[in-house]
């Protein structure tokens, strides 16, 4: 199934716009019809079992994290229509990091670097350590 703007996922999440694609699938901004809150929906596109288990593990790890500089997955669902799993996460409306860096003051940039390092240090302190694998410059 190809998702598009306006798609209603599980009679709850109204897709508003496509953000991008990653290792496991597509990411969309959606409105949660139950709360009227914008969320990010990460839909697992490939249907192989190994990839699905990794996607599920990503949710489990994210759900258990507790750090102010890390996003927390709120829900793992399976689309009733096409059986594709999806994650519901907070939507960050300020755009990508790369779109923000150019307008940051030097002091804000150093705070940002400190916050990223703090989040990564938290991940690396877990047992076993969690390696992010998708950090972009």
Question: Predicted segments — roles?
Answer:
Residues 96-105:
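AlphaC helix of the protein kinase catalytic domain
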Residues 28-29, 36-45:
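Glycine-rich ATP phosphate-binding loop
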Residues 82-96:
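Conserved short submotifs of the Hanks-type protein kinase catalytic core
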Residues 118-130:
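Protein kinase catalytic-loop region centered on the HRD/HxD motif
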Residues 16-23, 27:
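Protein kinase glycine-rich loop
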Residues 72-85:
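Short beta-strand micro-motifs within the conserved protein kinase catalytic domain, predominantly
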Residues 45-64:
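AlphaC helix of the eukaryotic protein kinase fold
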């Amino acid at each position: 199934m190809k998702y598009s703007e306006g798609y209603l996922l599980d009679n709850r999440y109204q897709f508003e716009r496509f953000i991008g694609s990653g290792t496991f699938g597509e990411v969309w901004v959606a409105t949660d019809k139950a709360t009227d809150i914008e969320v990010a929906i990460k839909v697992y596109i490939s249907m192989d079992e190994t990839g699905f288990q990794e996607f599920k593990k990503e949710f489990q790890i994210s759900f258990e994290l507790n750090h102010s500089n890390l996003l927390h997955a709120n829900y793992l669902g399976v689309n009733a229509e096409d059986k594709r799993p999806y994650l519901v996460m907070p939507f960050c409306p300020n755009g990508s990091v790369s779109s923000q860096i150019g307008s940051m003051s030097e002091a804000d940039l150093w705070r940002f670097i400190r916050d990223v390092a703090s989040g990564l240090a938290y991940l690396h302190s877990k047992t076993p350590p969690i390696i992010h694998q998708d950090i972009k410059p």
